[in-house]
């Protein structure tokens, strides 16, 4: 698996990897991460992938991170 690009964002690290005919987009925020796999035969290029990973997509990821953080925090009784 190798890093092929990054998407700039002020609140999270977004890294695009390539491995076995798949693009893997990893979002990282604090102690949590989310990863999404896209088949290279469907997406065709990193440029097309970046069109998919738009602000609306990133906003849904951010909402999920908020839910994950609440669950993480609850696990420690905070």
Name each model-derived stretch.
Residues 1-34:
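N-terminal acidic leader/helix
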Residues 33-41:
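Short amphipathic beta-strand/extended segments with alternating polar/hydrophobic composition
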Residues 42-78:
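Mixed-charge, Lys/Arg-enriched low-complexity segments
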């Amino acid at each position: 698996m190798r890093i092929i690009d990054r998407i700039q964002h002020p609140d999270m690290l977004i890294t695009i990897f390539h491995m076995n005919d798949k693009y893997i987009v990893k979002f990282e925020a604090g102690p949590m991460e989310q990863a999404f796999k896209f088949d290279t035969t469907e997406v065709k290029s990193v440029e097309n992938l970046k069109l998919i990973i738009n602000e609306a997509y990133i906003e849904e990821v951010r909402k999920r991170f908020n839910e994950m953080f609440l669950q993480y925090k609850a696990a420690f009784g905070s």
